[in-house]
Amino acid sequence: MLTTESPTTTTTTTTTTTSSPSSDIRDKFIFGNLEVKVKEVKGCQLHFLNVKCELALKKTEIKTKPLANHTFFDVFSFRVSAATSELEIEAWKKNFLFKDKMTGSLTIPINDLLHANGEAKWYPLSNKKPRSSRVKKENITNSNNKDNNTASPSSPDEAQEKGDEDQHHSADESPAEETSPTTGRPRSVSMPAKKVKAAPEICLEIKFVLNEPPKEVLKGIVLDGVWNSENNFGSLINNPHWIKCTQYLLSIKDEITPITLKLRQPEGTDQRCSFFVINYDPFYNGSKKVILDTTNDIKKVSSFNSPIPATSVDCKIDLEPGQYCIIPYAESFAFSGTYKFNLDSEKLDNCEFYALPKSQEQAWNEITVDGLWTTATNGGGDINILGWTKNPQYSFTLTKKSRACVLLSQDDNDKSVGFYVIKQLDAGKRAIEFREQVGKTESFKFSCSTGCTLTLDEGTYIVIPSTYDHGIEGAFHLTLFTDDKNATFQPLTNAFQEVEQVKGTWVGKSAGGSPNQPTFFNNPQFHLKVPASDKDEVIAVQLIQDSTIADEGIGFIVLSRDSHSEPLTAQDFQNEMVFTKTSNWEKRNDIVCRLHVKPESPREFTIIPSTFDPSVNRSFKLQVYSDVSISLDEIEQKDESSDSEQNDD
């Protein structure tokens, strides 16, 4: 009866390190005590163990014999204070003639230490890598020759012997083979299975007690703040939304004061942050600052515009007497979180620190309008060329004397932009004359935002934004900040309904000069006719000289007389005929005078434009603006030859 014997199976249990759940320990302070109990070592010959953590090194008792298995009763305590700490254990075998030999090692990372709870646990000890033995050159040569001879059998018998060698080990290599005395052929011998050696391991009890990190005590003035989508727009340089960031006012009273500013976030907040220290003008008087020029406004801090962003920021700076605006920011746009802002100084009595605005009454009335430049509506920024009147215009009305700041912003900085602010001269109408400028940007520049501050009386004003070059298309935003809670700001689209234009020339005799010259009445003359009405009418008369350098003074007078069929002469002129005139003869491209025509006023007028000096040859245009139908024609000069013939008769 045949029986089948099952092969014997040997099972080896190997303990491996179980990876603990990963903890995000970045930017955390770790303070705690680590207790390590060494209980037992298996499969590793040693005399003693070295246990290291950070800079501390401790040694177990030294065993008398280097047995593979040892029991220990050592307990070690370590201070853990760094996010890169780890526990290192080394097994050493003493050598009384040579250096001691390390027979095993173990490294436990910080994450495993943080989750250790004092339970006994087996950890594998890694064996020290054996040194590679040197092979003599002749052995390598003999081995190569043997391999060559074996690889190429020259006869069938050798091939057969080669096949036998592939199936069986040589007697020198394996004790499981034996040579038969009769045939000389090897035969198999049953041998017991070789026992697998267990991996070396160590049993440890590790307990980690996490201590609360020492609390930072902020001295001086501490202000609490909140970041959210409404007040955090990242780094504010070249950002048109900077005005919405939280601002603090720091006042240094009467001497240079060294201060320390600290920006702190809650523990564990992984958000880089920083702040700017910016000059604060007395103009703002407790209101938030409208930053117009970061180049000149930002105080340099250690050659940086702001302290280097980090999860917490410290800054030491000496400040002269004055006021400074401090703007904290989180690096991620619209980040939500809390923070503390701390000011400390040896001269704290010389400092004042609070959030802006100082009171609700000092909060800005903020009004924003959106606009668009097109090829047809962008006349450029040169006010000496009448194309500027094509630009968009916006009017704001102040109900009292007020502070105002106008900010022009664009979504990028690829266009050179700026604006002018002038007083509105024609109620409810777009400006036709560049006069009574009250403010402007310092220059046209490639920037995301630019603006100016103003202190203005009650009234209506016009903002004229433009690019430096005409015809460029693009979107823009205009924002008015004012302490007048009843102020209004809106696009200005209304214009005069009627515009009449005639062209003329000053040349030769017709270039008669100003009224101070006896030849004044030789200048071209024009007949303006206004229809009868029971309402007051405002008629704007504009004289434009065809010159871009405005090198000649120009002006005109408006006369009322009985007949306008012929040019007025010096002999017929009377002072009572003067209805109005330009205030002066000015060197400018255009000049405007307004006629206030009442129901009882004359309705027909003679207009005589001129240069200031006589004999100046130049062409010109005369334009009349009105909301009623008007007529404007040149009065023909008398034919002098006909007059002389009539006199001869």
Swiss-Prot record:
Residues 15-123 form the C2 domain. The record marks 192-193 as: Cleavage. Residues 159-172 have a biased composition (Basic and acidic residues). Its main location: cytoplasm. PROSITE patterns: C2. It is found in: Cytoplasm, Cytosol. Residues 458-489 are annotated as: Domain III 1. Belongs to the peptidase C2 family. Has a weak caseinolytic activity. Monomer. This is Putative calpain-like cysteine protease A. It comes from Dictyostelium discoideum. The lineage of its organism: Eukaryota, Amoebozoa, Evosea, Eumycetozoa, Dictyostelia. The gene is cplA.
